[in-house]
Amino acid sequence: MLNRFFRFFISSLVSLFCVANVFAEPVLQRLSNGGSLVIAHRESSIPFSYLDSNKKPVGYALDLCLKIAEAVQKKLALKKMPIEFLQVTPANRIPMIEAGKADLECGSTTNNAERREKVAFTIPHFITGARLLVLSNSKIERIEDMFGKTLV
């Protein structure tokens, strides 16, 4: 079942990359002409995107992006497709995609309305929720217990 989910996930991502986004056409044309796929990555967003001890980009999100690259290469019937890595920061990752300096950003970027106005997102591959922690001897047991208190 996991294999079926993974195939569905990858095919969905490839569909988004190849079809849904009008801006993908110049990228696909460049790749067809022998150009490189530029994958943006983070330096230390463990476990999603980080540099290993050899300064090689690795991580869960990188693995997914490399699977997307394989699928795009297959879809375009390319014998080889060069891949370049571009290290980005939280401050420049969206601008690098907007400027066309990177084709995919493989990290832990949160999908929100403001960012969706600038770039397209795939289906989520990680979902999290906010948690609150207090000392075990605190009198705070519910969210309502924090009303009127100063929070940092």
Give, region by region, the residue ranges found by the protein language model:
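Acidic, polar ligand-binding/catalytic clefts
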Residues: 66, 78-145
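Extracytoplasmic small-molecule ligand-binding "clamshell" domains
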Residues: 29-105
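Phosphate-coordination loops involved in phosphoryl transfer and adenosine-cofactor binding
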Residues: 34-36, 140, 147-149
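Cleavable N-terminal signal peptides
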Residues: 11-12, 22, 68
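Bacterial N-terminal signal peptides that target proteins for export
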Residues: 1-13
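Short, well-ordered beta-strand segments
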Residues: 38-40, 133, 149-152
